């Protein structure tokens, strides 16, 4: 089976300010699909915090999803497409507030579509590299 990069790209969205100590998504190489951590915990009869330890003892069929730091990506985008004043303003905010303000600014500036295309492109690159690193057949 071959995974379509566009089908998995959005699973890599990661917000470090939520401070989770576990992966939200896992890829089942056999079924060629993403599975959320809660379902994985049920499958392996463990809590989500123990998944890495439990799965590391398996046959390598499950792979933790890639992560793209979305607030960092938003700042990268802001430095390229927003005014210097807006980017400087965002940079001074705590990450959670910055994310909210970034969304407000791109909506106000009518840049939402451009942002989502930019984000998808970066997520797709990360997904493709993750597939290569984990020997997962893919198509773009």
Place the predicted regions along the sequence by residue.
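Amphipathic protein-protein interaction modules
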Residues: 65-123
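Acidic, proline/glycine-rich low-complexity IDRs
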Residues: 114-140
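A structural signal for short, well-ordered beta-strand segments and their strand-loop junctions
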Residues: 26-27, 64-65, 139-140
């Amino acid at each position: 089976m071959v995974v379509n990069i566009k089908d998995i790209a959005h699973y890599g969205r990661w917000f470090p300010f939520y401070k989770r100590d576990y992966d939200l998504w896992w890829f089942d190489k056999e079924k060629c699909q993403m599975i959320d951590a809660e379902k994985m915990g049920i499958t392996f009869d463990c809590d989500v915090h123990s998944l890495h330890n439990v799965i590391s003892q398996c046959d390598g069929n499950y792979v933790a999803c890639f992560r793209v730091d979305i607030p960092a990506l938003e700042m990268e985008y802001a430095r390229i497409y927003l005014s210097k004043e807006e980017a400087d303003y965002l940079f001074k905010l705590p990450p959670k507030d910055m994310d909210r303000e970034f969304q407000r600014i791109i909506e106000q500036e009518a840049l939402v579509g451009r942002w989502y295309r930019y984000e998808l492109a970066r997520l797709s690159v990360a997904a493709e590299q993750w597939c290569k690193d984990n020997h997962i057949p893919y198509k773009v």
